[in-house]
Amino acid sequence: MNNLRETYIKDVKRIVVKVGTSTLTYPTGLLNLNKIENLVRQLSDAQNRGIEVILVSSGAIGAGIGKLGLKERPKTIPEKQAAAAVGQGILLHMYEKIFSEYGKPVGQILLTREDLSHRTRFLNASNTFYSLLEQGVIPIVNENDAIVVDEIKFGDNDTLSAMVASLVDADLLILVTDIDGLYDSNPKTNPDAKFIPVVDEITEDIVAAAGGAGSSLGTGGMATKINAGKIATSSGSSMVIVNGDNRNFLTDILDGKEIGTLFLGQEDHVKAKKHWMAFATKPTGSIIVDDGAEKALVNHNKSLLPKGIISIDGTFQEGEVVSILNSKKEEIAHGITNYNSMEIDLIKGLDSNIIEDKLGYKNYDEVIHKNNLVILENL
């Protein structure tokens, strides 16, 4: 393992792997069962290493094309959506069946861009991912092709996977495609194209080198992967573009081997993200916690539970940034709250298992999840 790959890959704890239509299907549109089985084996093995795994899978439309007996990718939006509606069920059933052979539970998450742009829905999506990962579930993500017009007309799962990587604070995003990585020109048309093993910054030259190559069944070319790289690396995730024809691509990446093109995540992303939560957004209210909760938050990286809350100050809604004060009214943290001020006032000091009895419902055990919390003294 060389020093650069060791630095950026050796300690990854959470990865997002995106596979495209060209990797999952044959040119006929039918599913490539051999590649799917190999993919599942590697993802399962990665989880066995202790790495949390999220799969962003294209292929719903491609699978639907095969099932419906279509000769080529549909051109109209209703035809594409019909193929996606049929294909999504086929794809998930296939994944569930093969993952079960390795004893791995899976959960389907269908997202739209709106889910990741609306504050409350963004928070809900984030909490769903964290809950699944904590229970050892492998989330399988796709954009909801059956209903989202914009995705089918303009979008791609490369961008979606980068947004998911940012959403869950992934250490590494892996885009699996049908070429070895990034070249200085399109290798499909230029036999003298030179391979680029590492990209430390996405410059105009890198964008120009991406070109626009894409397959007949998919929507994402290299240009969309570079755009995904901008999103991922700016939020701190490193990214690798790799050829899915290599049967051990994921194992090789995690072992630090020279495979694919590595895009280096920006090292100051954590600080930047924490500064956003700590300083860029003014808290709309405060939560005062007891000494036990303060210790759990500051020293043990725990979530804030209602039992440790003494009182609240101000009026705020679910999904807003609030200030957390200790019993001496000293500010110790900022966080994104799962409950509004009225709800917290009702459940403060109570065990989480009593939330439903008090409110009539329980959306979360935590008032603020540890992943949505920044300890100010750590900045």
Curated annotation (Swiss-Prot):
Enzyme class: transferase
UniProt entry tagged with the keyword Nucleotide-binding: yes
Catalytic activity: L-glutamate + ATP = L-glutamyl 5-phosphate + ADP
MF term (GO), any: glutamate 5-kinase activity
Keywords: Amino-acid biosynthesis, ATP-binding, Cytoplasm, Kinase, Nucleotide-binding, Proline biosynthesis, Transferase
Protein's cellular compartments: Cytoplasm
UniProt EC number: 2.7.2.11
BP GO terms, sorted: L-proline biosynthetic process
Pathway listed: Amino-acid biosynthesis; L-proline biosynthesis; L-glutamate 5-semialdehyde from L-glutamate: step 1/2
UniProt cross-references to Gene3D superfamilies, sorted A to Z: Acetylglutamate kinase-like, PUA domain
Binding-site residues, ATP: K18, T177, D178, T219, G220, G221, M222, A223, T224, K225
Chain ranges of the PUA domain: 284-362
Recorded family membership: Belongs to the glutamate 5-kinase family.
Annotated PANTHER family: GLUTAMATE 5-KINASE (PTHR43654), ISOPENTENYL PHOSPHATE KINASE (PTHR43654:SF1)
General function of this protein: Catalyzes the transfer of a phosphate group to glutamate to form L-glutamate 5-phosphate.
Name under which the protein is recorded: Glutamate 5-kinase
